[in-house]
Amino acid sequence: LSAAELGTIPTGNGRRQSYKRKAYTRMTNTFFEGGTNTLEEMVASVDYGYMIFDTNNGMEDPKNWGIQCTALYGKEIKDGKFTGNIISPVVMSGYVIDLLTSISMISKDVVVTGSGSCGKGYKEWVRVSDGGACLKAKVKIG
């Protein structure tokens, strides 16, 4: 309906949890393609940081370019090696442009699963795929 109102070509982005719910615009196929680095090379290049695992939530503020993601845990890296220290849970935040411009490495391997969901508020959840390549980037954790 919104494509017709805007005079544009429909993209199929309107989805809803069930026929009883309102349709909302949803994103499509957003993930990072594979790069040229192995995970081992990426870890070895880190002076100090964390490798984050099992991301499970995220949201963006399209007006102000903010982003926030959560993950189950992170493994500490010092001098290119895992230390054995784990932090949990992990909350990452920042600005989309800062995050994207800080990406310095992208893994060769790409994993996409169908286990994600796209939520609109607290009542609208639609299954989506998620995943992609691993990224080396700078984010604020806390």
Residue ranges: model-predicted function:
Residues 1-142:
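N-terminal small-residue-enriched
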